[in-house]
Structure formats: C-alpha cells, structure tokens
Amino acid sequence: MADMGAFREAVIAWAAGGPGDRARELATRLPVRAAVLLEGPSDVAAVGALAASRGRNLAAEGVCVLSMGGAMSVGRFARLLGPSGLGLRLTGLCDEAERGYYARGLERAHAAQFSAAQPSAARSNAAQSNAAQPHAAQPDPAQRRIFVCAVDLEDELIRALGVTRVEELVRAEGDLRALQTFLRQPAQRGRSSQQQLRRFLGTKKGRKIHYARVLAEALDPARMPAPLDGLLTSL
C-alpha cells in the first residue's frame, strides 16, 4: 500500500532529475494536500515529534514533511510541488540565515503569496506594537506560511527547554562525557552555554537528528517556540 514515505522518495527522485510520474500518481492516490519544505532531516524529526505531541499524524492528514537537503533547493521543490507543479499548498520552516533562499525560491516558482514569517523575537515585538495600535491592519495568515527560526531550530528548542533541562537530556542519552570533553575545547571559551550546546549537537553524524527528536519530545506543548507553533497551526 502506498504511503507518504513513498511519495516523499518519489519527490526527491524527481527533484534530482528523475521522472515525475510516480510522484503525480501518489499525490492523487493518497491524496496529498500540502508539503512542508524543510532544510534537513533534523528538522523533519523535530516537526514530526512536535506534531505527535499534539496528537497529530501529519502523513494521515495528507501533509508531506520533506527534507530538501539544504535551503538552496527550495526553488526546485517549490516548482515541482507548488502552483506550477502538483498544486500543493506549500509551507515551511527555515533558519534566519536562509530566509533569502526561501523568499527567492518561492517567488521564482510563482508562489509569491508565500512570504517569510518573522522569527520569535520579531514576532514578540510586532505583537506588542499591534497591541498598542488596535486599528492597525493585521497580516493575512495566507502571507505567513514560511516560518523563520531566530538562529536555527536547535537554538529555538534549547531556548524553550532551558540549558539545565537540555543538559539533563544529554546525560539521560549517555552523552554527558562527550559533552564535557567538548566543553573543555579552547574554541568553546567565551561562548554562552546555549551556544555551546547548540554546537555540540552538530559535532557528530546523526547527533543533530537524534537530539532534534529528543528535545522536541521533551518540550511542553505550551512552551513550543513561536515558529514551530505557527507552522503546526497553519497546517
């Protein structure tokens, strides 16, 4: 029986230059109604875990959560999946540094109605400004389908959980000694504990993916970072 994983694999093969017939067939058969464009597999792991914490199964809802292998690929995937391709509703999550790739890629794919949402800090400031101006025009929700992490997804999760809780999770996962060794490196001097933890998560192959899921599962749904909350609410 065809599933969302098969559709995801078909889309990735199509984006790599293969035929698109299989993706088109599965999009209709499943059916698929929306695609979430993410930079990498750690983002997919976190989004899946956070959705599950809210009792949601995105695949069963017809939502394909897709790792593109980097933000520079967003234009290619948007062309295949968006208005000029399969006609799916597009949304996504990106790092602040990659905002431009998303904006340009979506515009070139004739999906200009999708614009980058503000990162957490900017959203907070905007909310305060709007509260002071009750008659100010509010952004159209349809214009806020790309959600931007202030630094990256790991940074959002670490800030939401707090350094102490993340260190407890690292200990529980059996990586405390590796973390202590990492923290003794001269390059880590002068960095905040939050910055050190974020860098630690990317020091070993597979660690970022693993901890994206661990941190997301440990997060209280009520404390979900704004970009992630916005993404899930939009789906």
Mark where each language-model region is.
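Conserved beta-strand -> loop -> alpha-helix junction used to position metal-binding or nucleic-acid-contacting
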Residues: 59-71, 96, 140-156
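Short phosphate-engaging motifs
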Residues: 43, 73, 98-100, 153, ...
